[in-house]
Amino acid sequence: MRFLFLLCCWVISFPTYCGAVEVTPQVEQWGTAEVSLPGPSKGNPFSDVLLSAKFYEGETSIEVDGFYDGDGVYRLRFMPEKQGKWRFVTKSNVPELDAQEGEFTVTAPTGNNHGPVRVANTFHFAYADGTPYKQLGTTCYVWNHQPAELQAKTLETLADSPFNKLRFCVFPKRYKWNENEPELYPFEGKPPRTWNTERFDPKFFQHLDQCVLELQKLGIEADIILLHPYDEGHWGFDRMTPVEDDRYLKYVVSRLAAYRNVWWSLANEYDFMTEKREEDWERIGELVAAEDRFEHLLSIHNGKRLFNQTRPWLTHASIQNGSAVEDPARAELFRDAFRKPIVFDEVKYEGNIPKRWGNISAEELVHRFWAGTIGGTYVGHGETYLSPDDILWWSKGGVLKGESPPRLEFLRKVLADSPAEGIDPIDKWQNPEYAGKSAEYYLIYLGKEKPTEWLFKLPNPPQLVGLPPAEKMTFTAEVLDAWNMTVTPVEGTFTLKKLDDYFYGDTKGRKIKLPGKPYQVIRIKRVHDSD
């Protein structure tokens, strides 16, 4: 009879296993497989219970930590990077959670599932399946702490925007234009300062899960800011002890690391968190990198003092520096210094608030995006227009009011048409306005200059195996207006001849006519025999 009962249990619940262990039966490659188990709710499940599981397929084996999700439910999340049949077995100090086994099937990815974003070609990014990722991010620091209706409006706005990354905070923010209390808090307790940091509020983190997944549906990366200084003791989340920090970070990573669109930002303006020292950030960075078994991108954002961006656990440099992207040459220097992708996540914001960091023009912000791009780096957007209801995009989200987003959509289309490997400086020591892929694709950004013509000339193309001699290379040209969002083809083609030690020009010595306006870009592409 007992055998018959077990057989019925297996048939009825497959692939939900006996003992009420539930597992996602089928998941896409780079999707999220979730295992749910019932367990003890007495005492403090967050600290008393240890739970992990080993997931394996063939010779591949990955161990992840589980977490308590409230109401007697424990979860383990896993992001499979291989297709096939995966199995798991749990390990716990609680007998009812220990040695639980199961399996699930991983299928091919569909739709906009290209996997997590990784570093590619030293200075650039690509999804795990090799699809290029050209970062065009924006910032809504605490959109996730606003009323549900406003959160929905933010997602609606993002869906119709050019942005493919959103920076936002786990913890709420206390700052000018952002003084409302959130509806949920990360810990059990009583606001504003009475918290039991040993007990998390699962509802807070369940909502965070949902925010990440909503962005994933839109194809937007979630650049999650784990710590920030915009508290100043109001809640005290910026002044937790190292033990409290570590416990919180482990919990967040165990919950979110299995979502493919997650990026980690250890802190925003880390150096403004005066309670922490450099060794604290080293510990925090090493901890997050070690706890994340899926190796998501990881960065730390600066205020006035740059962090040591050469640290091996930092995958890319997240930089605040508006002047660095006023021209391409300055932006490019950061690449040489750190030898990894550079994302200028904060270059000041389009807006009109009475703060110098939040009142640059749309023209200036768009210019900085282009200058950063030509420097072989990436730039982030923000918007701070005053509003009677204190809903500013940079903090609370809502709707975009500025003039830069349509121009950034134009840039997005240009980037989508650019070389998959990324845009790199071509003549950085002398003519930093040239970028692209030498001998194949060029963007020459003239910035704030207002020329009426441009002599066709290209820095010496490389003489590599598979490339024709320079004198046999032919190119087409277009004039792009970065502000007016126009593309004007230039008539005819251009065949190279040597001008001097550094440049090749057109055999006919032609010049390209320009409108005498700023923000002009000349796009040049080599003509192939198959074209």
PLM region spans:
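Positively charged n-region of N-terminal signal peptides that target proteins for export
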Residues: M1-L4, L256
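Non-catalytic, glycine-rich low-complexity segments
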Residues: V21-E59, V64-F67, E103-P109, G115, ...
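Active-site mouth of glycoside hydrolases
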Residues: G111-D327
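Extracellular glycoside hydrolase catalytic/binding regions
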Residues: R247, N268-P406
